[in-house]
Amino acid sequence: MTQQNGKGLEIKEKFPFVDYILGTHNIGDLRSLLSGGAGGVFVEDTDGYINDDLPVTRTSMPNAWVNIIYGCNNFCTYCIVPYVRGRERSRTMDSVKAEVERLVKEGYKEITLLGQNVNSYGHDLNDGTTFAKLLNLLADIPGKFRLR
């Protein structure tokens, strides 16, 4: 929730002893924030930003999971996802394709595409990207593997 507009300031006001405030979208910035030594830093949502450069450790050969969309726009009564993860943010098709290609080259055989609602993939990109187009693109990757 801290990445949502205004939440970082609200937390800082209520808990002034907290040195760093950042949300799940900014976990990749943690090292640079800590090494910079600047206390009182908080990072709010950066409109659709997705850090594709985070290191991934996979220990589930031959299965791999690939996030294609983060967040949710549904705000179901019983669910906290939109409040914690924010609104839907899709990765680009090129980014997803590159990750799946790497996985196939590394020998992964079953690749599961992840998201709270994968059918919403691409709607936020406003460039005609759809889940169906992503599936067609990934189906053209050479190699023996299964998409789920």
Residue ranges of model-derived segments:
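Active-site core of PLP-dependent enzymes with the aminotransferase class I/II
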Residues: 124
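Proteins enriched for Cys/Gly/acidic motifs involved in redox and nucleic-acid/cofactor modification
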Residues: 1-121, 136
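Alpha-helix-loop-beta-strand connector modules within alpha/beta enzyme cores
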Residues: 127-148
